[in-house]
Design a protein with these regions (language model features):
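Short glycine/proline-centered loop/turn elements that form peptide/ligand docking sites
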Residues: 199-202
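Transmembrane alpha-helical segments of polytopic membrane transport and secretion proteins
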Residues: 1-45, 215, 296-334, 416
Length: 471
């Protein structure tokens, strides 16, 4: 008889544990830093820092240092002989006046467009944004043909009516404010339209039912609710007015009215160009822009202390203008004629003439397309069109590609120092365009990379200028 015994399972012997070798801290940091995500983030941060800071560094270096060392001689040449008071007065009057006009027009038009049953809404909207589409230099030239004291069409129309007692003069500080304010008002309009659309009109209705008057409701309810949008509009218009060049150059220089941008242009046009004096003027303009940002931030310190919440089915109800509707309709048509129809008409009229002449039957009979034919035959025109298309497409693609990664880094990631990337991205917003151009000239005049005077330096300038808008 065979006896079967139950055998015990064999014990599993674990493999020997290798001795613990502590990883060097630097190795761990290097392994974490060499991941693809980290490398991409570092590259984007480096590009943003280069675009934002390097031009400013070279601008300050070229302003305060020359071949002998540290110097402030450029400031003496730029602001000496009492020039600083005149520059500050003209620049602040121009910027503040244009901001006040554009803010008044843009906010009023946005309120009428969104919150009332204003007539001609399609015409109203077109008239409110078309000036933004017209390039600033063309818009300024159109107003020269309209309101010049010598050849202005408006003066030709109103002169016989007033017996030449009233003459429009666009070549003045008031003309500069008028043209810049009209051209900038669409920016305010677009910002305020969004603000008014998101505001609950029942708050205004409640105030009216409680006995408040319309001016009281506007001052105590409406404007406080849209205060953040108002301050954003003020900041943007102040900076764009300070950096404006076409309007001061075309309208101010003829009457000897200098602002910072036109003075920088004048200094650079002298021979030999005084780069230190131009840099000193650019530093002053930059300080003005930074001061404007600081004041705007100070005023906005309490702008986010409250908010309104509406349901999904919320739709703002338009306010009935009643007997004022025809009056508002006339105002809208007049505004459209002044800001859109008249400038475009005078540009078209002038383009069909061999040389400018006042309208008459003989002039209309001599109109032709010879100017357009001459432009199409110019090789420079084809090159300009090609360069414009290449710069537009390349700038938009490059900025969005880089800033999309930067926005993800700021919003979605947990990487330390991401707030620095966000702050660097908005540095070009407070750098006036002429200052940025001068800064880039300081950089690439000294650079061994031969891109000065090529399309690539324009690409770098555009990418730097529009970098904040992609964030």
């Amino acid at each position: 008889m065979t006896t079967v015994t139950r055998s015990e399972p064999l014990a599993v012997i674990p493999p020997p544990v290798p001795p613990h070798v502590p990883q060097i801290r630097g190795v761990r940091w290097r392994n974490a830093a060499l991941t693809p995500k980290t490398l991409i983030v570092a590259a984007v941060a480096g590009i943003i820092a280069y675009l934002a800071l390097v031009p400013l560094y070279y601008l300050l270096y070229g302003t305060f240092f020359d071949g002998t060392g540290f110097t402030t001689g450029g400031f003496g040449r730029a602001y000496g002989n009492g020039q600083i008071a005149e520059l500050l007065k003209n620049s602040l009057a121009f910027a503040i006046g244009a901001a006040a006009l554009s803010l008044t027009l843009g906010t009023s038009l946005a309120y009428l467009m969104v919150r009332t049953d204003v007539p001609f809404k399609a015409l109203f909207f077109a008239g409110s944004i078309v000036p933004l589409i017209i390039p600033g230099i063309l818009y300024t030239i159109s107003w020269i043909f309209l309101a010049s004291p010598d050849i202005g069409l408006l003066n030709a129309l109103i002169g016989p009516l007033t017996n030449d007692a009233f003459v429009l003069n666009v070549f003045s500080i008031w003309g500069m404010i008028w043209v810049e304010g009209l051209h900038s008002s669409p920016i305010v309009f677009l910002l305020m339209v969004a603000a008014f659309r998101s505001m609950d009109p029942s708050l205004e209705e409640s105030a009216l039912m409680s006995g408040a008057t319309r001016p009281q409701v506007l001052r105590r309810v409406t404007l406080p609710l849209v205060k953040p949008a108002l301050l954003s509009a003020v900041l943007i218009i102040l900076i764009t007015s300070l950096e404006s060049f076409e309007v001061p150059a075309l309208l101010g220089l003829q009457d000897g009215i200098y602002v910072f941008t036109s003075r920088i242009y004048f200094v650079l046009r002298t021979y030999p160009p005084d780069l230190a004096a131009a840099g000193s003027l650019a530093v002053g303009l930059l300080l003005l822009a930074v001061l404007g940002v600081a004041v705007s931030r100070y005023l906005a310190r309490g702008a986010k202390t409250f908010q309104t919440i509406t349901g999904k089915g919320f739709r703002p109800r338009p306010m009935d203008l009643g007997k004022w509707k025809p009056v508002v309709g006339v105002v809208i048509v007049t505004y459209f004629i002044l800001t859109v129809l008249a400038p475009l008409t005078v540009l078209m009229y002038t383009s069909l003439l061999s040389f400018y002449r006042a309208p008459s039957l003989e002039v209309f009979q001599s109109m032709g397309l010879q100017n357009y034919a001459a432009v199409l035959e110019l090789s420079q025109a084809k090159t300009a069109l090609k360069n414009s298309l290449v710069l537009g497409l390349t700038t938009a693609t490059s900025v969005m590609a880089v800033m999309a990664v930067a926005a993800w880094l700021v919003v979605r990631s947990k990487i330390r120092g991401r707030s620095i990337v966000e702050q660097l991205s908005f540095v070009p917003l407070v750098i006036p365009g002429l200052v940025l151009g001068l800064s880039l000239s300081f950089v690439y005049l000294r650079s061994p990379v031969p891109i000065y005077g090529t399309i690539f330096i324009l690409l770098i300038a555009y990418c730097t200028k529009y970098m904040p808008y992609g964030m």
